[in-house]
């Protein structure tokens, strides 16, 4: 028991000590707060409580973070530099050195509007590249679509850009937004016109529906009976109708009913329709018949197009001409020889064209034919005729004179070489007229020999491979003209025709 009492007495002593310490601490805090309270509330007056202000130094610029925001003069126009010279300087600085307009003008202002010095100094500096990259521009557009003109929020998406640069780029970007191509403008106009036309049609449909509803209600409503009594209306005599309040009171132009898009009213047509009560029905019948005929034409054209498309689906292999397997042959048949002579008469020495006409001969084979058969088919004269056709034809008077001179200049050697069959006086032969001479000198059709002039029946015509001359008419072959100096007795083959010439 005494031990327990001692323990309890010791514990109570400890508790009392702790309580005493806490009371002493609380009292000290209260005293300190009471001491501080009068100190805070006192008025501080005197030199001890005043701030020491340094002297003003206007020349020294205080370092601050807003130095970049200060403006700097970039360009000031001067009367010593003309506009043409200034434009030339700007283009040269842009093309050669890559300066923009602002940088080039700043350089010119730095050199006090001396163009030559500024041009010489442009190569010593490298201009800043474009500050706004493609990514920056895209980010700016997105930020502007989100935040509008709140440039502080836009700067949060573009932290490396200053607000003045954002504002500057905004105004330059705003100008480019209004630039649209001509095609876009035209598309917008057409879209607006279509929308207006659709709105007009819808308004007319609504108006027509309203009119039909009004007519139906009028038909359904019973006809009121006339009641003659003073209690119905307080006024006697004609009653003035109250004007209906228009739906488009503020817009009187909209109250006008316009025809649908594409329909225009013509005064003559309206007067013709209003002439009689049957004219509208007749006009509608005519328009319906025209519409039916046009629909038939459209249907026929569609059927034709569908049939043509079906025929094209199979391809065009059936329409192609069959390929001829022509084999080259070195042998010349009679028909090929005659065709080659006519081709020489048509194309001259164009062996490629002649080979294409023949089909189974090469140009080299045609050339060898021309060389080997030159004398047999008289190809030199045929070639001369072709050359004469290529040259411009002389006038008819000169051709007549050449015919006379050629007829008189025949040599006796040519007369001796020919074989005499009959003698015919030159006076008995009638002179050909000018029209016949012109017809004989006309150009022949392609691949055909020229027409032979009319001659007596006893005279033989030359073979088809030896065409007659065009420029110098000569007597037919194997016929010799009779000599004029010593006329001889006619042979028995001529008969009475020769006797009449010498009588």
From Swiss-Prot:
Keyword Nucleus: yes
PANTHER family listed in its UniProt record: REST COREPRESSOR 2 (PTHR16089:SF12), REST COREPRESSOR COREST PROTEIN-RELATED (PTHR16089)
Pfam families from the UniProt entry: ELM2 (PF01448), Myb_DNA-binding (PF00249), REST_helical (PF20878)
InterPro entries: ELM2_dom (IPR000949), Homeodomain-like_sf (IPR009057), REST_helical (IPR049048), SANT/Myb (IPR001005), SANT_dom (IPR017884), Trans_reg/Corepressor (IPR051066)
Protein function: May act as a component of a corepressor complex that represses transcription.
Protein's name according to its UniProt entry: REST corepressor 2
Domain SANT: 127-178, 327-378
PROSITE patterns membership: ELM2 (PS51156), SANT (PS51293)
Gene from which this protein is expressed: rcor2
Biased composition (Low complexity): 423-442
Keyword Transport: no
Organism field: Xenopus laevis (African clawed frog)
Record's compositionally biased regions (Polar residues): 399-412
An example Gene Ontology biological process: negative regulation of DNA-templated transcription
GO CC terms: histone deacetylase complex; nucleus; transcription regulator complex
Major place of residence: nucleus
């Amino acid at each position: 028991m005494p031990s327990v009492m001692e323990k309890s007495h010791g514990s109570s002593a400890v508790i009392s000590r702790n309580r005493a310490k806490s009371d002493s601490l609380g009292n000290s805090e209260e005293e300190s707060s009471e001491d501080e309270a009068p100190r805070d509330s006192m008025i501080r007056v005197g030199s001890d409580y005043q701030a020491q202000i340094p002297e003003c130094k206007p020349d020294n610029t205080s370092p601050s973070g807003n130095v970049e925001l200060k403006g700097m003069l970039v360009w000031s126009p001067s009367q010593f530099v003309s506009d043409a010279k200034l434009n030339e300087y700007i283009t040269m600085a842009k093309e050669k050195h890559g300066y923009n307009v602002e940088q080039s003008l700043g350089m010119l202002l730095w050199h006090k509007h001396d163009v030559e010095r500024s041009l010489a100094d442009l190569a010593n500096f490298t201009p800043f590249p474009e500050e706004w990259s493609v990514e920056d521009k895209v980010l700016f557009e997105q930020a502007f679509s989100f935040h509008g003109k709140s440039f502080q929020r836009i700067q949060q998406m573009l932290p490396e850009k200053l607000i003045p640069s954002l504002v500057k780029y905004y105004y330059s970007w705003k100008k480019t937004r209004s630039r649209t191509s001509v095609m876009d403008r035209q598309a917008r106009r057409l879209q607006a016109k279509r929308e207006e036309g659709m709105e007009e049609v819808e308004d007319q449909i609504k108006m027509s529906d309203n009119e039909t509803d009004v007519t139906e209600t009028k038909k359904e409503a019973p006809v009121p009976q006339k009641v003659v009594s003073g209690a119905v209306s307080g006024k006697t005599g004609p009653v003035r109708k109250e004007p209906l309040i228009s739906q488009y009171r503020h817009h009187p132009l909209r109250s006008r009913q316009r025809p649908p898009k594409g329909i225009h009213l013509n005064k003559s047509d309206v007067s013709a329709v209003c002439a009689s009560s049957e004219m509208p029905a007749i006009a509608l019948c005519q328009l319906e018949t025209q519409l039916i005929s046009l629909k038939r034409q459209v249907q026929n054209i569609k059927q034709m197009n569908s049939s043509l498309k079906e025929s094209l689906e199979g391809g065009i292999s059936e329409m192609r001409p069959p390929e001829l397997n022509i084999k080259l042959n070195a042998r010349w048949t009679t028909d090929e020889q005659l065709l080659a002579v006519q081709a020489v008469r048509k194309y001259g020495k164009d062996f490629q064209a002649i080979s294409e006409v023949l089909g189974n001969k090469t140009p080299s084979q045609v050339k060898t034919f021309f060389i080997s058969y030159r004398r047999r088919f008289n190809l030199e004269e045929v070639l001369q005729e072709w050359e004469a056709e290529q040259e411009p034809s002389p006038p008819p008077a000169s051709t007549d004179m050449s015919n006379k001179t050629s007829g008189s200049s025949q040599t006796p050697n040519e007369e001796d070489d020919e074989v005499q069959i009959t003698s015919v006086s030159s006076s008995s032969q009638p002179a050909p007229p000018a029209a016949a001479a012109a017809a004989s000198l006309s150009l022949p059709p392609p691949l055909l020999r020229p027409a032979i002039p009319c001659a007596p029946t006893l005279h033989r015509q030359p073979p088809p491979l030896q065409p007659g001359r065009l420029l110098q008419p000569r007597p037919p072959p194997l016929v010799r003209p009779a000599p004029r100096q010593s006329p001889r007795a006619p042979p028995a083959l001529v008969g009475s025709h020769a006797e009449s010439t010498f009588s």
